[in-house]
Amino acid sequence: MAARSKWLPILAVCCLLALGGCVALSGPPADSAYNWTTVTAVDSDTNEELATVDVRIADNGSLRYTGLSNTTSLGENEGMLFIHNSEGRYGYVMRNMAFAIDIVFINADGEITTIHHAEPDDDATFRGTGKYVLEVPYEYTTDNRIEEDDRIEIPEQYR
């Protein structure tokens, strides 16, 4: 009996160390966890193509939570498309962000409802209504004349 009680604390410490290692290894999703697609911004009045963006798809809770937090920058026509299960009012934050972005809320029909030009700020919440949220480089929407009421064409497989 004494031998058993001698090993119990050692076994407990080993279990805690193993559990701690599992938690440390289950950090944010790797870039390879994301699928990629291309979306197109279209002028609502003229149907002119304004820009195309290669986006990572964030379509589950873990990917949406992490977002661009572990990204150091975005390329010129690069972004992230967040896909929610249903249209609603959502709030986005700049958790652990090192650079500014535009946050574009898009309804289920692809119409832009709100555009925020967001500076890194852990305390700010950027709100809008939509089923999709597109994050692109800062002032990308201004530089490409993308405005509220314009459309974002999203491939059918992500609609």
Region locations from a protein language model:
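Hydrophobic alpha-helical segments
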Residues: M1-R159
